[in-house]
Amino acid sequence: MFVRSSWLLLWGTIVWASAEPVTLHIGGTFPMESGSGGWAGGEACLPAVEMALKDVNSRLDILPGYVLNMTNHNSQCQPGLAMQQLYDFLYKPPTKLMLLTGCSPVTTVIAEAAPVWKLVVLSYGGSSPALSNRNRFPTLFRTHPSANMQNPTRIHIMEKFKWKRFTILMSVEEVFVTTAKDLEAIARKKGIKVDRQSFYGDPTDAMKTLQRQDARIIVGLFYVTEARKVLCQAYHHGLYGRRYVWFFIGWYADTWYIPPPEEHLNCTAEQMTEAAEYHFTTESVMLSRDNIPAISEMTGMQFQQRLTQYFQKDTANVGGFPEAPLAYDAVWALALAFNCTRNNLPSHIRLENFTYDNKVIADTLFQCVKNTSFRGVSGKVMFSDSGDRIARTQIEQMQGGKYKIMGYYDTTSGDLEWYNKEQWLNGKGPPPDSTVIKKHAMTVSNEFYYPTILFAVLGIAACVFIYLFTQKHHERLIIFQSQPECNNILLIGCSLCLFSLFLIGLPSDDISISESLFPLLCHARVTILLFGFTFAYGSMFAKVWIVHRMGATENQQLASRQKDEEENTPWEGIRTLISTMVGRQALMRKSSGQAYGALLEKRNTVLNQPISSSKFYVIVAALTAVDVFVCFVWVLIDPLHLTEQKFPLFTPADSEEDEMIMPVLQQCQSNQQEVWIGIIMGFKCLLLVFGTFLSYETRNLKLRFINDSRFVGLAIYNVAVMTLVTAPVVTLLIHGKVDANFAFISLTVLICTYISVGLIYGPKIRHIIKVPPSADEIQLNGNVGPGVMSKVDQKRYDMLKKENETLQIQIEEKERKIHECKERLEELTKNSETEDMNAQLLCENDKQIADENLTYSTATTLTTTIPLIDLQNGNHPGQIYENDNDDDGSSTSSDEILL
């Protein structure tokens, strides 16, 4: 049975061969010159198609009894001309079963109209991605892969060389516009930034734009005529060389960059060659390079050698030579589809019966083309559902004026086969995708940071030393009467302020802070400096506030006491004492007790009373609570975060020209930064001004248990002036100058802390070192005695003491005279009564003289002298007062006065 069937098939073939073959007509358009379309592909593709027709017609196993014949026209890649040629194909006999088209513009207009006449269109040169639209082109198939198939290859190359930005330069033809849109969409999905520039005819303006945009990686989408114009302008604008990488379409001729004389480009061949060096091309594989024969029984290389014989010039200058294998395989695909259709048609329908309204033959032919699969000279030929050719992409680079294959990309698998043979003009690897902009964090220079940190460490160490020193000598009167607990808060605050300089100076030249830790650094800066200021200044403010309040209380008590003294003044008793000294000792003792009681009351005022430490703690705690509340609300609703303030770029002196430095200032910022700064600074400024006012008001007040109030006031003056001057300067004038900003802040903190600690603790340390503990006025039982007098009080005391000594001498002289008078009175009593009367009169006169001399010790003098003598001798007033209640009759009048 098998032998019989074979003989029947052979007999049928012989019969068909012996009979006159039936001619099947096809129409073809070929762009024989570039024209305005820019691709003269017909120059090589037409000979390739003719070669394929000859080979197909010579095969007895394909379309037996039929021969293929083609009617062709030169479309010049002009859509309008192509429409006229389509009209000729349709309305001039014979009937065409299928159409072959070349460039994309021509394919677009023919394939869009062909379904009306039930024609299948097979394109050997249409690469426009728009042609993949099945709704618009339902009967189109292409042996030329879509231009979109090269886009994944381009993206893989970008990723391989770590380029995150490139620019598309395209002509405005639809094929390139759609390719650019697809490439941009893929790039954005990969996180690659894409810029686009288009031109029509003259690319000069577009090249200037590329230069302004600092484009470095440029993908060109245009026909070869525009490609030469672009390359010439790239040379004139300097957009070539080691800093630039160009991607061109791979189906140009190998010497496409050499300008033909008729184009009159303003570039020589040498200039164009220089500009074209090291560019890349991507193109679908159009020629099989293996040794496996195709359906035509030729390998790809054999086909290329055979086609070369058709030309009398270098094939590099032949338009469409790379696409010729696609045109050759298109004829074979067409022939196989006809053969398939012949075998699948009903017996009563034959191929030669095709008309433009024959749907049966058209549908059968469409399905046969769609299912076509064979090995051609361009590789495996098959079509996708959209009619596109499925093929690998080849990447080449021009090196030394010749193209070298760099690798292949398989679209179906997504694998990039790379040979690592790429070369670069600079010899240092691929150039960057743009001018390398290196961010340079504007940090505090080491020349400022480390000396400041040194002084801060010394200040903290000094605070620790002073604390230990005062703890060791806490029993000394000068320490005990200065509120040491409040002063310890000052030391803590100063230490926190000094420690904050470590954080304010970060990041420095040698110390960097990660972005994740920067918000924590921001909050630490604010809180530590804020609490340090509150502790340090708040402790001093608490002192001047309490001094002011106690001074006000003392003034009220003094006013009340003066009112009482006006009604019953003790000086009347003193005058009575002086006037009745002789012979009236009980009365004199009573009057002296009344006078000293008034002096004792004047001495035990509010200013000399002990002060509880809790009063200072309450004030500092209240100020701290305000800061805690503000910071908590700030962090909760509007936290600080890292922001970068960018400054103008500059080119470093010792770097490559494609590298620039962008200074960046890292700042702590919140959404309502000005509001929070205003709240904090407003409160602190009011506190500073009020503290300065209180210091001025209490400048003359001396409290025994705040013995350093005068130095506290001076420290407040210093802090207020430095802070009120520095804050506006730092906030408004030098906010963006890192070193100046840090210098102002650090100097303010250092000066305020050093001067405050020095003013408050310097005199104490000096006193403790120079004055031994035995000289302190501290009683053995631990009760505190009188305070140390100031220089003014000491001078006043010396004057009153000298006056008192003078008065004491005068009193002694008068007492001596009184004693003499008494003796004379006794003698005269013995002689006679008359003499007694005379002596009595004489004594009365002397007594009168004594009364007049004793008035030199005025009430004011005695009022001041008695307490000052008591202060100088260290006597407790209670001891003297107890002696006043003693009825010892042996005391003389001088003893009573000199208490």
Swiss-Prot record:
Location in or out of the cell: Cell membrane
Q: Which Pfam families match?
A: 7tm_3, ANF_receptor
- Where does it primarily localize? membrane
Topology check: give the Cytoplasmic ranges: 469-487, 547-616, 696-713, 763-899
- Disulfide links within the chain: none
Q: Which InterPro entries match?
A: ANF_lig-bd_rcpt (IPR001828), GPCR3_GABA-B (IPR002455), GPCR_3_C (IPR017978), GPCR_3_GABA_rcpt_B1 (IPR002456), Peripla_BP_I (IPR028082)
Q: How does it sit in the membrane?
A: Multi-pass membrane protein
Whether Cell membrane counts among this entry's keywords is: yes
Q: Where is the composition biased (Low complexity)?
A: 890-899
Give glycosylation sites per the record.
Answer: 69, 266, 339, 353, 371
TM region(s), chain numbering: 448-468, 488-508, 526-546, 617-637, 675-695, 714-734, 742-762
> Signal peptide span per the entry?
1-19
Residue ranges the record marks as coiled coil: 791-842
In which tissues is this gene expressed? Expressed in the nervous system, including cholinergic motor neurons, but not in GABAergic motor neurons or muscle.
Q: Which PROSITE patterns match?
A: G_PROTEIN_RECEP_F3_4
Keywords from UniProt, A to Z, are: Cell membrane, Coiled coil, G-protein coupled receptor, Glycoprotein, Membrane, Receptor, Signal, Transducer, Transmembrane, Transmembrane helix
Molecular function via GO: G protein-coupled GABA receptor activity
> Region Disordered: which residues?
870-899
Q: Name one GO cellular component term.
A: G protein-coupled receptor heterodimeric complex
Functional summary from the UniProt entry: Component of a heterodimeric G-protein coupled receptor for GABA, formed by gbb-1 and gbb-2. Within the heterodimeric GABA receptor, only gbb-1 seems to bind agonists, while gbb-2 mediates coupling to G proteins. Ligand binding causes a conformation change that triggers signaling via guanine nucleotide-binding proteins (G proteins) and modulates the activity of down-stream effectors, such as adenylate cyclase.
* Domain observations: Alpha-helical parts of the C-terminal intracellular region may mediate heterodimeric interaction with gbb-2.
Task: Note the subunit structure.
Answer: May form a heterodimer with gbb-2.
Q: Which family does it belong to?
A: Belongs to the G-protein coupled receptor 3 family.
Q: What is this protein called?
A: Gamma-aminobutyric acid type B receptor subunit 1
- Give the originating organism: Caenorhabditis elegans
